[in-house]
Amino acid sequence: MIHDTIIIGAGPGGLTAGIYAMRGKLNALCIEKENAGGRIAEAGIVENYPGFEEIRGYELAEKFKNHAEKFKLPIIYDEVIKIETKERPFKVITKNSEYLTKTIVIATGTKPKKLGLNEDKFIGRGISYCTMCDAFFYLNKEVIVIGRDTPAIMSAINLKDIAKKVIVITDKSELKAAESIMLDKLKEANNVEIIYNAKPLEIVGEERAEGVKISVNGKEEIIKADGIFISLGHVPNTEFLKDSGIELDKKGFIKTDENCRTNIDGIYAVGDVRGGVMQVAKAVGDGCVAMANIIKYLQKL
């Protein structure tokens, strides 16, 4: 079988593309590595998506998934490891199968950026990248957030009403937020401490993470806590595009034009994976734009 389009990733952008594909009567398939709905499920309260004055991230993710299922978008849970673009139709190779398609929408999003110290051995044992996933393990306990700007601010906001104390460690002289209201919320919290100009040196602990060694103006000290959340932002999920011929920028994000087209005719990228502003509203718009252009493209074949 040759699909009209294959959508790689079932976040807001991918599912929007899928909805438009099904409404356009395309033979579409969506392939998702983890959970349909995307990384928005990890968010706390979402207040900037039109139509919902206030909604929890996981609830919004579920609504996206349900909407796509209403239009019977087929979603297969598998990991895409390679796409072959030299011949038509394109070939999408997963861990468990191979698929042929006339067009592709890449909506693989991003993943947490690592600290680059010794944190890997403590993941699940005091180290986490997801406040919404793991915050309640630290009810009335002390936690550390290591990060910068909006990611660190969001994590601290998610934790401040759960943890006894939140210590934000940043290597910057100030924190900047994508929306000033977020910074206001953080400053209003009386259980949040911010340590500026602090360079993390090492995660300390034996069986589990117990704190972090930092250097502030050349002076080293150890900050103790029950848990540590790393919030340094995200990097694109584009490793599988190696040797695909699809152009990436120096940070690994997919290069596209204003219509979400890549340098290869028939292949599009939507949402966070193409960089720029990383917001649900933008990803949804990208999904709409990409699939509208794919429908036009297919009509000309």
Swiss-Prot record:
GO cellular component assignments: cytoplasm
Other noteworthy facts: The active site is a redox-active disulfide bond.
Subcellular location: Cytoplasm
GO molecular function, one term: thioredoxin-disulfide reductase (NADPH) activity
PANTHER family: THIOREDOXIN REDUCTASE 1-RELATED-RELATED
Catalytic activity: [thioredoxin]-dithiol + NADP(+) = [thioredoxin]-disulfide + NADPH + H(+)
Disulfide cross-links: C130-C133
EC annotation from Swiss-Prot or TrEMBL: 1.8.1.9
Cofactor(s) required, per the database record: FAD
Biological process, per Gene Ontology: cell redox homeostasis; removal of superoxide radicals
Name recorded for this polypeptide: Putative thioredoxin reductase
Residue positions binding FAD: 32-39, 272-280
Organism expressing this protein natively: Methanocaldococcus jannaschii (strain ATCC 43067 / DSM 2661 / JAL-1 / JCM 10045 / NBRC 100440)
Note describing how the cofactor binds: Binds 1 FAD per subunit.
NCBIfam families the record matches: TRX_reduct (TIGR01292)
UniProt keyword Lipoprotein present: no
Family according to the record: Belongs to the class-II pyridine nucleotide-disulfide oxidoreductase family.
SUPFAM superfamilies: FAD/NAD(P)-binding domain
Keyword Cytoplasm: yes
Pfam families cross-referenced by the UniProt entry: Pyr_redox_2 (PF07992)
Keyword field: Cytoplasm, Disulfide bond, FAD, Flavoprotein, NADP, Oxidoreductase, Redox-active center
Subunit composition and interactions: Homodimer.
EC class: oxidoreductase
